[in-house]
């Protein structure tokens, strides 16, 4: 222990000359110094305020403390050398100004960190590997990729992590985007192939595809929010417009439409004059008077619709009428049938509707006329001859 401290202390004062051990004479009263006294002597030159008298008192205390131990002759020869040099260094430290004190402290500081017996000086030291780690952490947080490149391999913020964010090149991004265009989810064999092709790892490609899918999902969501209020949804149908759509309704949308409502047939008023196209059918019938009269819309009466869906006139005559393929003798109280009022029944005239129907009186078997007409049967009854609306044949 004392040899180790001697070698450490000898390194402190390498700039001083050491006298030989035979130049000193030792009496029986001289005692060896213990390690504690050497430590006290070693620590004393650090403080520049101490005087020589204080250091002599320290040596006396060292003599008292060292009387308990009897070291060997070799140890006794080596110890006084260090003590004498400490005594020589003490007046120099006390009398020299502050620059010399700083120089001695600078000489002692490297060896004091390495010595085991010195008092530990606790100071925060930053080693080069710590500096490099912090600089790398700053570069990770501050470095941004160039335009067209993305950093998808993100590292956690801890300083211990060594993972660096991946900056993909433009060629790699083109290949990855093309692959994403065809397949959003990449299978493992294709991932291995892409990794070998682009000189990347499977993990980097997998993370890139994950981030790209999230970006695509976000873009689709933003587009849906932007276009949904005015966009055409598939459950919406275009509104029905005007005369292009003729439905089965109680009212006629235009004059020439022929819509039919089963429960309630529409009431035909005077403006609807061309519903059945009476003015177009002007071909004469065989056996009829050649001078015919058309019935314009002004000669129609406003017929009231009865509850049973039949049209009737107030003044009904017993004239045979063809209704639904049958000849029916219209009676004055007949309700549920379509009647033709104010039509005289001369024996010499007949109306041929279907080439097979006959009216008693004059049996007329004429050829089929493709345009049957409702005509006035006698010219002298033209003033009071009125024609009601023709019935709709519901059995067809």
From Swiss-Prot:
DNA-binding region: 161-220
Stretches the record annotates as Disordered: 18-163, 219-246, 364-396
GO CC entries: nucleus
Sequence ranges of Polar residues compositional bias: 20-56, 72-85, 375-386
Keyword DNA-binding: yes
Pfam families named in the record: DUF4074, Homeodomain
Gene Ontology biological process terms in this record: anterior/posterior pattern specification; embryonic skeletal system morphogenesis; regulation of transcription by RNA polymerase II
Function recorded in the entry: Sequence-specific transcription factor which is part of a developmental regulatory system that provides cells with specific positional identities on the anterior-posterior axis.
Family indicated by similarity: Belongs to the Antp homeobox family.
Protein name as catalogued: Homeobox protein Hox-D3a
Organism: Danio rerio (Zebrafish)
